Each structure stands twice: as C-alpha cells, then as structure tokens.
C-alpha cells in the first residue's frame, strides 16, 4: 500500500516537513560523493530554516511533557507492558533534557559561522556554489568523505533534539489511529468528524490502482478525492469507485 499523510494543523505540518528533511539529510550524509554531501549541507540549511520557527521548541516541550504526564500514572499497572512503558518514558525524558539544553535561537550556530553563512547565501542562487564563486568550499569538497561527514555531523548536532522530539510526537500520533476500509464512490469520499479534533489523516491505496488522493478537512468534515495522471502527468478526476484505507490520528 502507498501511504499518504495529511496534517490537520500547522504544528503537525511543520513536524512532517522536519521529518522529511531529516530523512533526506541522513540519506545524503551517508553517501561518498562531494555532490551528495552538498545536498546534505543545503538540506541542513533547510532544516535550520524550518526549525527556526519561534515557538517550535516550546511546543514540542509542552507536548512531550503532556504525553509524559499521561503515561506516567500507568507505571505499576499490571495490564500494561512495563518494559515498553519505561522505554517510552525514558525516551521522552531524555529528549526533554536535550531540548532544555538547547541555548539561544535555533540554528544560530550556523549563522554565526561566516564560512557556512557564505555558502548558505550562495546556495539560494541557481548555480551559485560553483568553484569560482566559493573556492574555499570547493577545497573542502576535495577532502576525504569521512572528514566531510564529520564536519556536517558536527553542524547538525545542535538540531538533533528537535529531530528526536518530532519523531516521538509523530509516532504517538500515528499509533493513536485505527485504519478502516472505506470506499470513495466515483472517486469521492466524505466523512463527518463528530466534533473530534484530529491532528493527522492517513490514506493508504493499492499501488496498482494508480490513483492519487487529494484531501481537505475542517473541524466538522473531511473530504478525499482521487485523481489519476494523464500522459503529461496532469491530474484528472477519477469517476470510478476507489477502495482505500483511512486512518484518523489524534494525540
């Protein structure tokens, strides 16, 4: 099944963006070629941009603390797997400690590094990081891959508590939902939300159907409409029934 996810609020939207960026960063950092490490570095700049939202750190700390207080009373409950519970609580407490230790403005260490700041300013220009534009950057790209990885890992380290916190919140949200099999009649589906507040919607479709879901929602109702791509990859509305799995997630 192909999984599509749709955030219901700006906070989850930001966390999904961070998750995607960190996954891309990790992939390219593990590669060998200097061009791949260039992508890792520019992705690091994107992470800092998204993570620099003023209230992101405090939002994550509040959510983790709320979840910790919800789970902590289950300690000693014979109906709960205690090892799993302690692992989750320990992960939360460790991540909260990491967030607490973050000092100053998020990503400020990148702005304070003049060399990185020069690369960042040139990277937004198409073709702006050529060797004649940034000879010192080109020289760094000629160093051993292990050295480049070590440098980039050092630059990402102050942002890792945000990655860990986002991963916990998204995991808890995803695990809260229960998938149900539904049918989009003539490619369209809608459902009343009965006043419940959700943070995330998941849509799973069989790859052989070759359909793409488009979703929208408000606090009363959600809509899912399916399209297919024509020869030019432009979306075209589906007029046949489409089976899919729907999961609504609420923290």
From Swiss-Prot:
Gene3D superfamilies membership: YacF-like, YacF-like domains
GO cellular component, one term: cytoplasm
Keyword RNA-binding on entry: no
Gene Ontology biological-process annotations: division septum assembly; FtsZ-dependent cytokinesis
Top-level taxonomic group: Bacteria
Keyword Transport: no
Locations listed in the record: Cytoplasm
Disulfide bonds: none
UniProt keywords, alphabetically: Cell cycle, Cell division, Cytoplasm, Septation
First-listed, main subcellular location of the protein, grouped into a coarse class: cytoplasm
Xref: HAMAP family: ZapD
Family to which the UniProt record says this protein belongs: Belongs to the ZapD family.
Protein function: Cell division factor that enhances FtsZ-ring assembly. Directly interacts with FtsZ and promotes bundling of FtsZ protofilaments, with a reduction in FtsZ GTPase activity.
Self-association and partners: Interacts with FtsZ.
Name of the molecule in the record: Cell division protein ZapD
Organism field: Paraburkholderia phymatum (strain DSM 17167 / CIP 108236 / LMG 21445 / STM815) (Burkholderia phymatum)
